[in-house]
Amino acid sequence: RHTQNSADTDRYGAETGPGLNAEIAKQTLPCYGISLGDITYSEGSRNSTPSMEIIRGHFSRVNMPIFNVMGNHDYTYYNTNASIDTSPESSTINLVSQRSFENVFGPINFSFDRGNVHFVCMKNIYFESTPQSKWNAGDYEGGFTDAEYQWLVQDLEKTPKTMKVVLCVHIPISTSNGPNISKVKNLLKSFTNSIVFSGHTHYQRTVYEGNRLYEQIHAAVCGQWWWSRIEGDGCPNGYTIHYFKDTDIKDAYFIGVNEGMNIRDYQMRIYKGNLRTGGKYAYFQQSHGENEYLINVFNGDEKWKIKVYENGVYAGQPTWIPTNKYTFNTGSSGQTHTIPSSSSQDWWAIGYHIGVCKRGTSGSSYQTNNYHMWKWTAIDPTAKIKVEAEDPYGNVYTCEDVVTDGLNYPDYIKSPLTIF
């Protein structure tokens, strides 16, 4: 996802594709892939849509069929000061600007069945579609046009209520209030255990809406726009594998694509709570105590069970840190920012991208939120810590490695093209 130039597409071909094929080779069931949008990185007057054909070539070398959802950066954008020329065949801005995607990847709204699961892939980037209006790449929200909603109604009318419905979109619907979002949710809730697969955010998160609908927001294989091999929330650049049996997901796990993070057991990272992270462009000082630990469980949510052992003896359960995004103005180069203990973010990952790579030194796009951070206060400050994390499917993962030096970043998280 998010390929803008040849360096980006080369990394997809060198890292993501082989990583996918290595994992596919381990499977005993037929595999299918869904790309959740932002395959390219078009914005404003910058068009990256020509790279779609290059990425399609890389997709063709992945050993499974890949279905594609359109993202907000997959439009053909024009200069924001130029009018959009429409035609009878493409009478709105939306239609004009989605043609490049359709020409390479096919329809933007479609569905298919696999067993007793009905997959629906839809575009849910909503722009004001006034012909001849001025185009602004940022003037969108998560939503569906009336025509798209009616298409979904007709599609689901043909689907038995006994089937599981998986709606695949780009922008998360659990955090969107755009046109027809609530209607789409109600449609999905008329089926048992519907699920939404989405992307867009560059972080991993699960959102439960009662017992009839939940959303899995997937991290990006490009991480922080290919500047490293980790996401802004600390997850590896990676993807999630879901195993379906009849109408249930019987197992699922997140996995990275790069060596050092491409094994199933790599599901978390532990930090000392008082780390100083970053580099010469910005430093970040955590405010937790010396005997406190932060535990980032990459795919963790409220249904995970986290346990801590000290010197091999069960010591208790850590406390989930309520989601809280701390933002700041970067200030002068090399400045140290004190991070409040209420922040749930992964400042080891943020520190690398901002402080070492000098990315996101203005704005907050690199100050990524985190929804899966826990805190543990050691009973014995000298004890050896082990964390055990059990997912909702009964899989148990353990970690004993603790990051104690926040300024020493391992090579396996670094981009091969931007070694700092």
Q: Where on the chain are the PLM-derived regions?
A:
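Extended active-site neighborhood of metal-dependent phosphoesterases/phosphodiesterases
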Residues: 44-153, 157-159, 180-197, 201-245, ...
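Short beta-strand elements
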Residues: 394-420
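Aromatic sugar-binding surface patches on proteins
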Residues: 327-376
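Short acidic, glycine-rich surface-loop motifs adjacent to enzyme active sites
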Residues: 36, 40, 156-175
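N-terminal active-site segment of His-dependent metallophosphoesterases
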Residues: 1-47, 418-419
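Binuclear metal-dependent phosphoesterase catalytic core
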Residues: 213-300, 304-313, 371-400
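Active-site glycine-centered loops adjacent to acidic/histidine catalytic or metal-binding residues
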Residues: 2, 37-38, 71-72, 170, ...
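Extended low-complexity, serine/threonine- and proline-enriched intrinsically disordered segments
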Residues: 304-339, 343-344
